[in-house]
Amino acid sequence: MLSVLHKLKELRILSQGDYYFAKLIADKQCHTDYAEPVKNLAILLAALCSWRYTQGNTCSQLDRYLEHNLFGLAYRTTEEDYLAEIHEKIGYLPVEDWQNALCGHMAFTQDPVNQIAPMAFQFGALYFYRAWQDEYRIVQYIKNTLKKYRTLAFSYDEIHQKLEKYFPEKQEKTDWQKVAVATAIKSPFSIITGGPGTGKTTTVTRLLLVLQELFDCKLHIKLVAPTGKAASRLEESIKNALGFMQEKMNVSHSLFNAIPQKASTLHSLLGVNAFNDYTRYNSHNPLQLDVLVVDETSMIDLPMMAKLINALKPETRLILLGDQAQLASVEAGAVLGELAQFVTQPYSHEQAAYLLATTGYKVEGSDCSNPIRDCLCHLTESRRFDKDSGIGKLSEFIQKGKADDSLELFDHYPQELHFNSLNDEGDAVNQVVKSAVENYRTFLKMLDDLRKQKIDPNAKNEQGISYAEAIQVQFNSVRFLTALRNNNLGVENLNKEIALALREQKLLWFRNEQDWYIGKPIMITENDHNVRLYNGDIGLCLANGKVWFGNREVLTNRIPAHEPAFMMTIHKSQGSEFKHTVMVLPTEVNPVLSRELVFTGVTRAKKELTVFADEKIWKTAIRQTVKRQSGLGKLLEDLN
């Protein structure tokens, strides 16, 4: 079996990690008396478990589809002979017998609660043991939290009064922001979901104000997000919401100061060690917090969510914010999607009665809902896009899978939506590069004028802001996004081609695109606490040897790992928004294409969206949803 897997590694179907994990299992079992087909099956499943995990699946359902398409070989006509060879080496054992065949094998456990092994079987699926353990820990946390806190510390009337203060607007239709705050007051674990502009951070700001009032401003609260960029956006949103409420609702000085206005990354909060799996804060040394707010939860993978849960005291109130319609985490798992799937169920009768008493809104109640439903609230009304917004309608059509209708919208909203059809890949690169040159011309002209007039970037212009800030605002008004990293239409090639085209137009001057040059935009790709730069931060080189991040300048020799940012991936854009977004899709079908990817790219745009894509590829992507295999939903179903 190893010889076949080695060939698949040479063909780059399997990674080095996939192959060497399988080899480890082979070495461990070499002196055992397992039958040869069983040994081969164990080696196969080790490679398969690793391969599936790196694709984002926390487990692999042992079904006929998996059996007939091992490692995706069924769709590779030149490599399909390897599939036949694999089945021969496991003695043509059918998939429904795989688990029984490995009963008692040293590398597998059928009872992961009581027995540890590298891999585990559960619910007819194959797991890495650590992935099963992470899912189990999350569900146990939710189960214990729901059971432990069934009594409210405050009366319905007290909660009602606070909600009326912070939601003075009278609405006939249900104000889901108000419902979300009431839900999170009652439950020490809550999830607030919603699309872009639905007011998740505004809602959580009101929630924190209510909680601090109820607890006499004594709560220790922290704000976190998965990336530095997302943390900055959370800070900005909280500050804006607080400023508005202080002005409109007479928030006291002490209450205002009781709400944190600084956010950190999850890695920073937990003290994650970059070289191993250890975190400073864990079950033995929990975070000393009363309330933790986590934004952009869709970006959090399974292992990180398990680490977070593990570091909380039982009495800490956890509030998760996110949009399950966006892309799931880069690494394995789709935690928010699994947790939020129960939002379509009605609330329990008990929760419905509580919401009626505290918010005045009547919601549907049921005896059959999953207990986690009472912890969830989904916000539906977008404040970013009005009812006549083309971007708003397009995002709605994409979310509903209306591929054909979505294309028609580009004709109905020509001022807001632009679709450029792509066919030939070479021509597509030229089209995208030409568009980038035109869109970046303005900020580079501003920078050139600054250079010619020998003006310090930190000097103030006529509007009272620094020239550095004005140039960055112009640069950030448009953002080019692409679906891929390695491809002619991928981020690496397009960044290079755009830089060369700008030099050809005499808008940039450099010898090598890898050099530091004035006008070069960069994106930080790893956190560096010493210089306070974080993954996702965007900077501009505005003077020799200096890069500006907002009003802060950093010497180029202190910049951590980074990459050019004329173009960035849609994945990296999560948590950001731009006045004009330009999105590029590949000209051929690619596994990365999905409805979630397109939705994420489209909803980065605030005022204008330009798309470069083949019409068939656009439709295919919208019809393709991400289906990551996980056992979290199955474990949650058993909460009843």
UniProtKB/Swiss-Prot annotation:
Keywords of the record, alphabetical order, are: ATP-binding, DNA damage, DNA repair, DNA-binding, Exonuclease, Helicase, Hydrolase, Isomerase, Nuclease, Nucleotide-binding
Q: Name one GO cellular component term.
A: exodeoxyribonuclease V complex
Miscellaneous comment in the UniProt entry for this protein:
In the RecBCD complex, RecB has a slow 3'-5' helicase, an exonuclease activity and loads RecA onto ssDNA, RecD has a fast 5'-3' helicase activity, while RecC stimulates the ATPase and processivity of the RecB helicase and contributes to recognition of the Chi site.
Catalytic activity as recorded in UniProt: Couples ATP hydrolysis with the unwinding of duplex DNA at the replication fork by translocating in the 5'-3' direction. This creates two antiparallel DNA single strands (ssDNA). The leading ssDNA polymer is the template for DNA polymerase III holoenzyme which synthesizes a continuous strand; ATP + H2O = ADP + phosphate + H(+)
| Positions with a binding annotation for ATP | G194, G195, P196, G197, T198, G199, K200, T201
- Give the main EC class: isomerase
Q: Which InterPro entries match?
A: Coronavir_polyprotein_1ab, P-loop_NTPase, RecD, RecD_N, RecD_N_sf, UvrD-like_helicase_C
Which organism encodes this protein?
Answer: Haemophilus influenzae (strain ATCC 51907 / DSM 11121 / KW20 / Rd)
Q: Which residues form a coiled coil?
A: none
* Listed EC numbers: 5.6.2.3
Instruction: Please tell me whether the keyword Cytoplasm is annotated for this protein.
Output: no
Protein name per the record: RecBCD enzyme subunit RecD
